[in-house]
């Protein structure tokens, strides 16, 4: 099992809106075990979205599916306007 963690620094005042949109995006893409979190400590305006995949190949399939799924693309519309920077990490559960 792999956890996919997408980490964003939202524009000031946009963290709540970004968190809500990431939840919608996860549901639209039928991601497994989607979790959206906002900061209590650390960097300000930090929003994290995590979900599970069985393997790196499943992750790759999801990325290709996302690129061609109109429902997922519609849910993501405008979300890049809500954050300034971000990164993705994949973790293997041991």
Residue ranges and their predicted role:
Residues 1-94:
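Short S/T/G/P-rich N-terminal loop/turn motif that feeds into the first structured element of a domain
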